[in-house]
Amino acid sequence: MTPYVVFNGATGGLGRHLGAAMADRSLSSWPIRTRLGDSAGFAHELDQLPMERGSIATFIQSAGMVSIKECEENPAAAHDVNVGRTVATVETFIDWTLSHGITPGILFVSSGHVYAPPRTGTRLTETSTVEPRSVYAKTEVEGENQVRALAAERDVQLAICRVFGMIGPDQRHHYLLPGLITRIRNGNLANIPGLDFVRDYLDTRDVSRLLASLTAGLFTAGGKPPVTVVNVCSGQEIRIRDILDQLLDLYYTDDARALAKARGSVSAALGRPTDIPWSVGDPSLLSQLVEGPIRTVPIVDTLADALAADPA
């Protein structure tokens, strides 16, 4: 049986692509517009959806407070959003579906930030040590744990997807890519924090496609998913400096002198105390669970699309 899919975070850089990704998998899906934690509003939206008794419905919980800087500046708000309101939203979905004779499933979007810092060159697996450092990561772990306990108590299907880095067009300002583009346009390329850090980035459209594939594969049978946690990652490392270099090539494609000047002005600064110099995931389990390649959008195409989506 194919599940219905309900998801939040529809206006974010990831959520805006989820509907199309679900349609490509022939999954009926609906974005939720109610603010996170508004249980009455969420239940009212669910009342309007044409989901039949005896069906399966999966809720993709992807909304949250994800700016590491904002979480550090306001830890109480981060906890309220990423734990309190998030768990309340998941519980509302479970209560509503069970009361309507629908089998619920939860796909909880978490983060690769939850892992302990690995040795350089080590790819993080689903069994790697969880040891969050930042406020954001700590709230993600607590959210995971509370949703896991709730799902176990209600005997509900749950898959936790720990997404590593995402880049894409139309991301909000606090993400890496729009931040670098703004620096290029403002000529502000000195003292970039964490410039030599190594990360694992996928295009937001690929992440949406992978979440759709996981939803179809893990929840269609109506039984327990074969996994509880899966890393959503490419396994391919890239330095933030290399992303900046590619952006500069694209931005100054017809002006070699300006390109050389811009490159000469680039310098690195220390990252945050909680930053991890190397964070790359192991996609082995993901590869077993999804159809097709993990990456379909090359990084250079992502960068070009981001520049085109945010013209000077």
Question: Which residues are covered by each model-predicted region?
Answer:
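NAD(P)-dependent short-chain dehydrogenase/reductase
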Residues: N145-R199, T204-S213, L247-L248
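Glycine-rich NAD(P)-binding loop of the Rossmann-fold in SDR/ketoreductase-type enzymes
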Residues: E73, A77-A88, V130, S134, ...
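Adenosine-cofactor binding site in Rossmann-like domains, unifying the SAM/SAH pocket
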Residues: S28-Q48
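N-terminal Rossmann NAD(P)H-binding glycine-rich loop of SDR-like oxidoreductase domains
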Residues: P3-D24
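C-terminal substrate-binding subdomain of Rossmann-fold SDR/epimerase-dehydratase oxidoreductases
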Residues: G19, N188-A312
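Active-site Tyr-X1-5-Lys
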Residues: D95, P117-T120, E131-A159, R185
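Conserved Rossmann-fold NAD(P)-dependent oxidoreductase catalytic core, especially the SDR/UDP-sugar
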Residues: F59, V87-V135
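NAD(P)H-binding glycine-rich loop region in Rossmannoid oxidoreductase-like domains
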Residues: D47-V81
